[in-house]
Amino acid sequence: MSKVKSITRESWILSTFPEWGSWLNEEIEQEQVAPGTFAMWWLGCTGIWLKSEGGANVCVDFWCGTGKQSHGNPLMKQGHQMQRMAGVKKLQPNLRTTPFVLDPFAIRQIDAVLATHDHNDHIDVNVAAAVMQNCADDVPFIGPKTCVDLWIGWGVPKERCIVVKPGDVVKVKDIEIHALDAFDRTALITLPADQKAAGVLPDGMDDRAVNYLFKTPGGTLYHSGDSHYSNYYAKHGNEHQIDVALGSYGENPRGITDKMTSADILRMGEALNAKVVIPFHHDIWSNFQADPQEIRVLWEMKKDRLKYGFKPFIWQVGGKFTWPLDKDNFEYHYPRGFDDCFTIEPDLPFKSFL
């Protein structure tokens, strides 16, 4: 049979997806984290893989799903949080724009799976299935009550799950995980379709969402999930030493306030007394696409006058950040390769060919 007749849609998908194959899985496994440091990789959206000097591996908000794929239904799902927020009827055109850089089914070494809240782009059934099928049988699933309810509903044993609320601390090898207050007001209006939010006092945030502070021997990482800006960031900054802070950034569409702005990201970094602030989430949705360089420009305008003690860092999905080695860098670039040029004799017609 000729090639063009043997190839199918399914064979095409399997040969190209996930786009990075197991490249990043292998990179993470091979990484030897030096004493006094921690390494992390951006998995897309707010997904992070954190690795400590003691070899602890944890992932947070690793999501392997997608957004809109068809114009079939022109209307938004009834009762969707964005419909509640802005009184809209039209379909939200949120297409996923980020490639899949980590294969969940190639994960073998992992010590904990965490989620900040139960929105679809922060918790994933495929990740849960892959860890249950291929990894150690004692890997815990850690998150607020709504996340644990989802995991259990998917088939993760209850005894493998740990419910956390602000103030709780969980130890995973040499990483101390502190659950802190979340400020995700969108989570509070994520309700069953038949339940009204108007005129009703929202239930507590603590069952729905948490922020995390990861204390490693090499430094600390603050993960804010989908939190909006809050004055309480300053309280967290007063109570904890925070080296690196991650904040959900995006260009909010008209009538919507769901992501922090460039000014909010700077206020967050200042309030937390962080050393480095890194925006994320702006990569994933086509309709919230934002330019993180705006944060850098605004920081340059304000840093001397306001005496900022932090720097912004502009990341790329799939890229690695090592604290404190990268603390003075402003922008990530993927490895460019060719560092071994001219280690063998070039095969060219003549020396000045190129």
UniProtKB/Swiss-Prot annotation:
Descriptive protein name: Probable L-ascorbate-6-phosphate lactonase UlaG
Matching NCBIfam families: PRK11709.1 (NF008688)
Molecular function via GO: L-ascorbate 6-phosphate lactonase activity; manganese ion binding
Catalytic reaction equation(s): L-ascorbate 6-phosphate + H2O = 3-dehydro-L-gulonate 6-phosphate
Compartment(s) where it occurs, according to its Swiss-Prot or TrEMBL record: Cytoplasm
A single BP term in Gene Ontology: L-ascorbic acid catabolic process
Gene: ulaG
Known role: Probably catalyzes the hydrolysis of L-ascorbate-6-P into 3-keto-L-gulonate-6-P. Is essential for L-ascorbate utilization under anaerobic conditions.
Predominant cellular place of this UniProt entry's protein: cytoplasm
Induction description: Induced by L-ascorbate. Repressed by UlaR.
